[in-house]
Amino acid sequence: MAVWIQAQQLQGEALHQMQALYGQHFPIEVRHYLSQWIESQAWDSVDLDNPQENIKATQLLEGLVQELQKKAEHQVGEDGFLLKIKLGHYATQLQNTYDRCPMELVRCIRHILYNEQRLVREANNGSSPAGSLADAMSQKHLQINQTFEELRLVTQDTENELKKLQQTQEYFIIQYQESLRIQAQFGPLAQLSPQERLSRETALQQKQVSLEAWLQREAQTLQQYRVELAEKHQKTLQLLRKQQTIILDDELIQWKRRQQLAGNGGPPEGSLDVLQSWCEKLAEIIWQNRQQIRRAEHLCQQLPIPGPVEEMLAEVNATITDIISALVTSTFIIEKQPPQVLKTQTKFAATVRLLVGGKLNVHMNPPQVKATIISEQQAKSLLKNENTRNDYSGEILNNCCVMEYHQATGTLSAHFRNMSLKRIKRSDRRGAESVTEEKFTILFESQFSVGGNELVFQVKTLSLPVVVIVHGSQDNNATATVLWDNAFAEPGRVPFAVPDKVLWPQLCEALNMKFKAEVQSNRGLTKENLVFLAQKLFNNSSSHLEDYSGLSVSWSQFNRENLPGRNYTFWQWFDGVMEVLKKHLKPHWNDGAILGFVNKQQAHDLLINKPDGTFLLRFSDSEIGGITIAWKFDSQERMFWNLMPFTTRDFSIRSLADRLGDLNYLIYVFPDRPKDEVYSKYYTPVPCESATAKAVDGYVKPQIKQVVPEFVNASADAGGGSATYMDQAPSPAVCPQAHYNMYPQNPDSVLDTDGDFDLEDTMDVARRVEELLGRPMDSQWIPHAQS
């Protein structure tokens, strides 16, 4: 069902919130009459931080105006005449408003659609059974909104009390002036006759005594009113503090944690709109109470009455200032984090936002934000309020930006679009720490004036830790540092402390999150996959995941120490798996065609009872980012065969599907799926022209085909036909016959001692020969060849 149809069914507060989304910036009538067109446009496809996307935004604006004009032209009749005029007026109004800033229209409509969907979703959840988590969130949000209503009522109550106090005090002052006037009348009585003077004095004295008694009583009443008002403000501030703690220390911190986990591939942190609405309500109520307290102080100064009120007001004034200071400084946040692996001389972006900028009128004097890079130690000193002025660890180009207020969405933000780290100054490293373990952070700082320069706040916020690299080869290890930090950072930590050890299940969760995000797949790591990884990491043979649940993994085990017998770390191997899947094998992983996380012996155990020609794909132990084919073919020499691993470089030449298609003795994908049924949709179409056909320029077109020379004789039997070596080799016109004799005559020279055809262990030798020759090896010498 269309969102607009559901939005029209909202009731109560939800309907009020929906109506508040519209106004001069975007009339609700436009939403109503163009609802279908608006919801069919790709508003989310426009990158608001990319100036080049301005063309898309302009096209959307033009489309909107044209649709409005078209709608207006189709109106007929008496009622249609008025609507025609109104829609035409809206078309002109929107054109004039957004002609020079079409991105703002996109931002506005995205904001409206997001909030409509949220309100509809919340309304639907409220009327139908929902998950316990959703219910808990709804209950929490309901409690927050109820507290805001309570705060609104008590603030209105203190406003009424303040007005009553002011009126009482004004009347008291009038009566006090009257007593002074009476006192002044005693002087002229000396000029009257004794009898008349006595009469007048008696009357004035009676009046004076009565008035002074009244003034004395009223002074006590005033003092009581003042104390009661101050006590009410104290209670209001207690409730405000509690509400602010829930919003800033719970909800906002949770959002920041989600943002941190999103850096590891977790779900998006979500919109800030709800948080901003809460922070704005806080700001509004805090400011109202602050103004009330200041007015109460003014009344006390206007009419001093000895008592405890002055001290009480000074206390609540200091408290309210602390509250507003905490609100402003805590709501200056990084909406879009800079890259956490930051390469020098490379453009990067970030966005900072002040969640209370609109309500406190900060945008009336747009502040400038400055970004600098500081070290972990400098970040610690900053949080201790130590003097770190001009103490930076590098130079960032284009590091200043003025905050802009977006009227349609009510957001105050600064978009750093073209920053670049020109240079970095590294600190002395500790022990075995490498440059890719050194953490920095981007410091954003500004100065905000609140209430017409009445209050001035110096605000600062730190980005998530970043690792600075100077070459792409460092990316792998830098990503490991970021992954560990994002996954295991504890709330309120000293920058940027993380546990040196974590439990294996914790690491499993982080690895699975990263894996699904990198491979862009819903098929995550299974229990069996995690057992394999645990066996690899702990050098253990147990096949029960529960046996590893109590074991700890240290950072050194994760990405500092090499795995036993290997020249790479656990993370480097795992990252290589993600890399090859992401770049070349994603559809096959999603199809379940890659088993992947099994070792050689496990592969043989799985294949032993399968028919000949059954194969599986597993990740290589000897080659980072390598994947190998293991298959069963029972011959006189051996039963199991393992092909030398393919890597990203191989798949950039010929795809996995085509390579498997070339090997016709591979028949079934483990456990029993016909190969062509799984892979045929990924085969590259074969050209219709014959291999000997000549192009216009006279050249013969070659073909690349996967060949396993040592398995040529077996292929005919496995394929069930009369396949010959020539079936798998190029045409003689492309590759001379004499060239074939260069293959080794004794296939056992590349076999394991146990007779298993495993060429993983020959790779280092092959690459060494390649280095000695100073040129790539001929494909004939590589156990699997593109011929």
Swiss-Prot record:
The gene is STAT5B. It comes from Homo sapiens (Human). Residues 589-686 form the SH2 domain. CDD domains: SH2_STAT5b (cd10420), STAT5_CCD (cd16855), STAT5_DBD (cd16849). It is found in: Cytoplasm; Nucleus. This is Signal transducer and activator of transcription 5B. Tyrosine phosphorylated in response to signaling via activated KIT, resulting in translocation to the nucleus. Tyrosine phosphorylated in response to signaling via activated FLT3; wild-type FLT3 results in much weaker phosphorylation than constitutively activated mutant FLT3. Alternatively, can be phosphorylated by JAK2. Phosphorylation at Tyr-699 by PTK6 or HCK leads to an increase of its transcriptional activity. Residues 232-321 are annotated as: Required for interaction with NMI. GO terms for biological process: activated T cell proliferation; B cell differentiation; cell surface receptor signaling pathway via JAK-STAT; cellular response to epidermal growth factor stimulus; cellular response to growth factor stimulus; cellular response to hormone stimulus; cytokine-mediated signaling pathway; defense response.
